[in-house]
Amino acid sequence: MAKEDNMPLVTTTEMFKKAYEGGYAVGAFNVNNMEIVQGIVDAAKEEQSPLILQVSAGARKYAKHIYLVKLVEAALEDSNLPIALHLDHGDSFEICKDCVDGGFTSVMIDASHHDFDENVR
């Protein structure tokens, strides 16, 4: 059942600032299906802990972007905890942009497939 005034997704910047000020760590967990999301969120609820749910490029292909976003939206309703949705190791600008446009609050680009000069230009 949905709770009133559900907390929206938060950014990792906001989350890390609060963690730094509060002297605690935030767990980041890769997810790709409902059971994994439920297990992680249930544990976070017990601890009343914020969390980062991460999605890899492979998970986006496996489970589809829209399904993963909806799972995380359900986690917000179920937990009312601070949750960030993070793209882990996006391999292109386009994938990162697609994730931001599609509801992710954090992305990390991994351009290690490019040579050093391309990465530092």
Regions found by a protein language model. Give the residues of each.
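Glycine-rich, positively charged N-terminal anion/phosphate-binding segment
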Residues: 12-13, 34-79
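N-terminal amphipathic alpha-helix/helix-capping segment at the start of soluble metabolic enzymes
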Residues: 2-27
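Hydrophobic faces of well-ordered beta-strands that scaffold small-molecule active sites
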Residues: 26-30, 51-54, 83-88, 107-109
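Long, hydrophobic/aromatic-enriched structural stretches that serve as scaffold segments
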Residues: 87-92, 102
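Glycine-enriched alpha-helix->loop->beta-strand junction motifs that scaffold or abut catalytic
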Residues: 47-49, 101-106
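Glycine-rich tight-turn/loop motif centered on a GG-T
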Residues: 24-25, 54-63, 104-119
